[in-house]
């Protein structure tokens, strides 16, 4: 069990609870937030306890990185879910949206199942995978949006590749509209 930690004079931003104020934060022995906001000040801290003065710094909810290229599966020698988690947490990132540019490419439900299990077992952060817009990232045939979305994919993208065929892109956008799913397109003419 850890000691209580006290942080004072921080700019606290928490959109979910409509907080945007200067105040403090108390983290309990269980590692959970006990109190936050402008009511947390030196009056809330036992006289012998030390506190960290965060004047000029911010306390915010965890950051979501919306475009992460992780090496798993296939390129684990570059990065895996464990190393991604450590690097992300050190910068305040608690959730990532991973791109489908892996080996194998995330374009079918069996790979999604593997990825979700692996992320759950190895990552210390939230992993939200995307699937490719097109099979094998080739820009010619759409993936099965409905099946992939049902497996927990939060969006579709070909990562750093772009869809150059306007007819295909139109079909993709119609399908995305019908299924109410997110499409992320890298903007670049080739």
Model region roles, listed by residue range:
Residues 10, 25, 31, 56, ...:
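Divalent metal-coordination and catalytic microenvironments
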Residues 1-45:
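N-terminal metal-binding scaffold of metallo-dependent hydrolase/deaminase domains
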Residues 57-119:
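Metal-associated gating/positioning segment near the N- to mid-region
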Residues 102-113, 118-190:
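Histidine/acidic-residue-rich, glycine-tolerant segments that coordinate divalent metal ions
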Residues 41-59:
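Active-site metal-binding motif and surrounding structural segment of the metallo-beta-lactamase
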Residues 30, 48, 93, 124-126, ...:
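A generic structural signal for alpha->beta connector loops
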Residues 7, 50-52, 64, 97, ...:
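Hydrophobic/aromatic beta-strand patches that form the interior of the parallel beta-sheet core
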């Amino acid at each position: 069990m850890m000691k209580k930690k006290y942080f004072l004079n921080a700019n606290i931003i928490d959109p979910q609870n409509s907080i945007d104020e200067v105040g403090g934060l108390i983290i309990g022995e269980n590692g959970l937030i006990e109190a936050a906001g402008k009511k947390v000040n030196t009056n809330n801290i036992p006289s012998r306890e030390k506190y960290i003065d965060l004047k000029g710094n911010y306390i915010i909810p965890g950051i979501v990185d919306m475009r992460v290229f992780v090496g798993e599966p296939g390129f684990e020698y570059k990065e895996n879910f464990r190393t991604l988690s450590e690097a992300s947490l050190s910068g305040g990132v608690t959730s990532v949206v991973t791109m489908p540019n892996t080996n194998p490419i995330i374009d079918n439900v069996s790979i999604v199942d593997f990825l979700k299990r692996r992320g759950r077992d190895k990552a210390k952060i939230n992993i939200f995978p995307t699937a490719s817009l097109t099979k094998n990232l080739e820009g010619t045939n759409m993936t099965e949006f409905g099946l992939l979305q049902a497996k927990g994919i939060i969006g579709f993208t070909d990562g750093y590749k772009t869809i150059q065929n306007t007819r295909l892109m139109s079909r993709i956008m119609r399908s995305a509209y019908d299924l109410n799913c997110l499409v992320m397109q890298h903007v670049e003419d080739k």
